[in-house]
Amino acid sequence: MNYNKKTVRDIGVAGKKVLLRCDFNVPMAKDGSGIITDDKRIRAALPTIQYLLDHNAAVIACSHMGKPNPTFEAYVKKQTEKGKDPATLTEEKWKKSLAELSLKPVAARLSELLGREVIMAADVVGPDAQAKAAALQPGQILLLENTRFEKGETKNDPALAKAMASLAEVYVSDAFGAVHRAHASTAGVADYLPAVSGFLIQKELEIIGGALANPKRPLVAILG
């Protein structure tokens, strides 16, 4: 199997808007404080982000976090399955559950790590994301809201994938922990944009390729 895939170095990004799929599914404090308890996944995305910014791209980052219920009906169904009384389930509680999975804390931490502003969109492909993506300039970075807030994300809905792709000119896949999922933001968008991998995926593929082609011995293979 060929593990040499095209990366961001193989495509021109200067002056272009780049949709970057990251894996910002980071653990949060369980007290609802919005504190990130481990930021290594954010740090893992920095080399690709910094490369794009240094090469004058306008970066539109996106990621999922957790397993939110994108509609109130889905929320009620899920909570009912857990044994909750439907009469106690309100839209206010549903919206609170969404707020707890917002990427706003990620934007704040990413801003600290980059030493520059990270613009936060209030939605994924809605009016706010569209307006901010359209206004984004080279050297700036925009973070879309949790992709799983869109009900079409986990279904790889072509309409959602096309809407996300319309925000940019190039797609960079760098969410190694999520690339096995055929979702709109990980698979579908690649049908509408030139697509390459980021440095995190490149690194992981090199490790996998080396382990298969020339493994260090003795070795133990664990399959699950």
Give the ranges of each region predicted by the language model.
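Active-site loop-to-helix "anion-binding N-cap" substructures in soluble metabolic enzymes
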Residues: 1-224
